[in-house]
């Protein structure tokens, strides 16, 4: 689904990545589209679901592969809504390379880069580097729908293909609370789909760390030159 909205000064084009599983590259593993999702009765670590559309679920009580969008993006504004059960873990990767962490971090007071809303660390030479903790723990309880609103500036390259500017998270807002501002990234974060850096790349949803569901993924390409 691609929509254009015109104002007196500009045209804004956006598209949703939760219209069809066909918007995502094969294989999609156990990911499927459902209509309703709730915590399982008596078990906050798993989901129960009802048939329908609009919600992408990796698995009610386990894990599967990561999802990579067919669509490629550079500079972008991204809105994404997600829910995890108790103790579960996922992540949203811009360009398949740079992760904003999804985790059940409800109630934690000592938070780090690996908590929900964190920009995950890089992994070089067997050790972690450069992770960025969210400024505030804005997490909601397990099973509640949460949101990220992200403004991302892609890395820049010269005509020889050499990187001349780092990728940056200009803004990350978690459940309406700003948690990052203008964070520069020296390279892909841990468990990225690609080790290199490029002007364009796909959205990646991590599905191999536990149950997670996503809805209302809205991608708005930008030009941040």
What are these regions (language model features)?
Residues 1-225:
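Carbohydrate-interacting regions of secretory-pathway proteins
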């Amino acid at each position: 689904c691609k929509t254009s909205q015109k104002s007196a000064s500009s045209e804004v084009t956006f598209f949703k990545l939760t219209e069809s599983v066909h918007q995502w590259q094969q294989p999609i593993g156990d990911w499927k589209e459902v209509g309703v999702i709730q915590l399982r009765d008596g078990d906050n670590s798993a989901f129960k679901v009802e048939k329908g559309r609009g919600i992408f679920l990796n698995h009610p009580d386990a894990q599967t592969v990561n999802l990579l969008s067919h669509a490629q993006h550079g500079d972008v504004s991204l809105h994404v809504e997600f829910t995890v059960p108790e103790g579960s873990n996922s992540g949203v990767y811009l360009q398949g390379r740079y992760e904003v962490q999804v985790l059940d971090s409800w109630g934690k007071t000592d938070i780090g880069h690996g908590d929900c809303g964190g920009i995950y660390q890089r992994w070089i030479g067997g050790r972690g580097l450069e992770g960025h903790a969210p400024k505030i723990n804005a997490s909601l309880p397990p099973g509640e729908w949460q949101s990220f609103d992200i403004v991302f500036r892609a890395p820049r390259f010269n005509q020889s293909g050499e990187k001349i500017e780092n990728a940056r998270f200009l803004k990350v807002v978690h459940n309406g609370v700003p948690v990052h501002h203008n964070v520069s990234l020296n390279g892909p974060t841990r468990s990225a789909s690609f080790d290199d850096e490029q002007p364009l790349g796909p959205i990646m949803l991590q599905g191999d760390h536990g149950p997670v569901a996503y809805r209302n993924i809205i991608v708005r390409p930008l030009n941040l030159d």
